[in-house]
């Protein structure tokens, strides 16, 4: 199982506390059918799915790279790079357990693109309609969508 969080990761961060904790959304490569409901349900386009053969799936989430399952891993590099503090590390409580999340304040964002350039997962993007897309807000919609496929490839750890 690939744990898509900041565990065992910190070489790219500017400070020790800029990385998220060891909690996050986990992806089980063996169970995943690259079917795409998790990416379609994600309100912030934080998940990009390409099937194992490299063909793009018909969804809002697309990537030029083949054979990848990319999503925000809450590493916090975008938080460190943001000069206006529009991005901050925060917490969400689910089933009485605290999880890391990245919080975005659009009114502080000047669309400089520093977070987009530094993101190690290459999931952040700027556009005219929404100032910033691609960060995980821990809404858990991807997990619900994956559960409906009976594959349970995504889980909260």
UniProtKB/Swiss-Prot annotation:
It comes from the Archaea. Its cofactor is [4Fe-4S] cluster. Residues 23-52, 62-92, 100-129 form the 4Fe-4S ferredoxin-type domain. GO terms for molecular function: 4 iron, 4 sulfur cluster binding; metal ion binding; oxidoreductase activity. It comes from Methanococcus voltae. Keywords: 4Fe-4S, Electron transport, Iron, Iron-sulfur, Metal-binding, Repeat, Transport. This is Polyferredoxin protein VhcB. PROSITE patterns: 4FE4S_FER_1, 4FE4S_FER_2. Binds 4 [4Fe-4S] clusters. [4Fe-4S] cluster binds at residues 32, 35, 38, 42, 72, 75, 78, 82, 109, 112, 115, 119, 136, 139, 142, 146.
């Amino acid at each position: 199982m690939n744990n898509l969080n900041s565990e065992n990761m910190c070489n790219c961060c500017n400070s020790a506390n800029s990385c998220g904790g060891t909690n996050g959304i986990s992806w089980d490569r063996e169970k995943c059918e690259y079917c795409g409901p998790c990416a379609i349900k994600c309100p912030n386009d934080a998940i990009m799915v390409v099937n194992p053969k490299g063909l793009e799936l018909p969804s809002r989430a697309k990537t030029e790279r083949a054979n990848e399952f990319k999503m925000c891993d809450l590493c916090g590099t975008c938080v460190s790079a943001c000069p206006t503090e529009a991005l901050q590390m925060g917490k969400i409580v689910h089933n009485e357990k605290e999880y890391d999340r990245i919080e975005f304040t659009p009114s502080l964002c000047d669309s400089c693109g520093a977070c987009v350039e530094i993101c190690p997962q290459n999931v952040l993007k700027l556009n005219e309609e929404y100032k910033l897309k691609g960060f995980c807000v821990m809404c858990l919609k991807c997990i619900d969508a994956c559960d409906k496929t009976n594959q349970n490839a995504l889980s909260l750890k």
